[in-house]
A protein has these predicted regions:
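Acidic, contiguous N-terminal accessory segments
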Residues: 1-131, 136
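Feature activates predominantly on carbohydrate-active enzymes
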Residues: 76, 81-275
Length: 275
């Protein structure tokens, strides 16, 4: 999100990242009275917004949230910066969030979560915001250091609340191959993510406004693959698997037709898992 300051520069809101514009009421204005969180939608909405609000704000007792979403059918892959914009207003009777898309509404709810956690829900608070950058990503190298699925989900939770929108998962390298290929199980590491686990993680990410982007390293960085499939290497000889960091010589043979079959079928398998 844009790092521009508030209208009152001395009263910046404790929000990460700082919103594009915000107006904070005077100190004399008391915090809004707490009440059980309720949702009211002005029109048809994406069920993901409702689930997001209840998951993160259900126990915050922020009272009534009036949500207005202009177009709930825009896919996350297609959104631009302006489609993630939102406006948030705290009134005495309710909290209002208006957004052009599902994803803007989710960003607004993330801001509301941050404000509510710090007891700053004062009547008169208003925020207008949109991202400064289209790609706000985090890359995790699970090839060299396997990360349990539950930890990945917890990471996605925190990413979403801080308005990151891309999780780049580095699934393979010389030290490991974590994509649980059913077509080529011989190249898969002992610790890996099954296809169903990755599908589930992709859905979990999308429900929180985060795209899951997989990476399989080819034709280099393939020591782990060549150790099981020496027929794909230029030398035709197996390499020893390694956990050492650094430069490794293993690569796939571009003159070998079987390499193209291997790569094509692997990518087809990958594309069936990730939206």
């Amino acid at each position: 999100m844009n790092a521009a300051g508030c209208v009152n520069e001395e009263k910046k809101l404790p929000i990460i990242p700082q919103p594009l514009q915000s107006v904070y009421p005077p100190e004399t204005v008391e915090s809004k009275n707490s009440a059980p969180t309720q949702l009211k939608f002005a029109k048809e909405h994406d069920v993901r917004v409702e689930k997001y609000a209840l998951d993160y704000l259900g126990n915050q007792d922020v009272g009534l949230i009036n949500l207005s979403i202009e177009d709930a059918n825009i896919d996350l892959v297609s959104v631009g910066v302006s489609e993630e914009s939102y406006e948030l207003r705290v009134l005495e009777s309710a909290i209002e969030i208006s957004a052009g898309t599902t994803w803007g509404a989710i960003r607004g709810l993330a801001t509301l979560w941050q404000v509510a956690k710090q007891g700053r829900l004062n009547s008169g608070l208003s925020i207008r915001d949109e991202p400064r950058f289209l790609w706000r990503g985090l890359m995790l190298d699970v090839a060299r250091h396997f990360i349990p699925l539950n930890t990945l989900r917890e990471t996605v939770d925190r990413m979403s609340l801080l308005k990151f929108n891309v999780l780049h998962l580095h699934l393979s390298d010389d030290q490991g191959f974590r994509f649980g290929s059913k077509k080529y199980p011989e190249v898969v590491s002992e610790a890996f993510y099954s296809l169903q686990e990755l599908k589930s993680l992709a859905t979990y990410c999308m429900d929180r406004g985060v795209r899951l982007i997989p990476e399989i390293d080819l034709p280099g960085h393939v020591t782990h693959i060549v150790a099981s499939r020496p027929d794909l290497a230029p030398t035709g000889r197996a390499t020893d698997r390694t956990q050492k960091f650094g430069v490794h010589r293993a690569c796939l043979d571009p003159s070998n037709e079987n390499v193209f079959i291997f790569v094509r079928e692997l990518i087809e398998e990958l594309s069936n898992v990730f939206p």
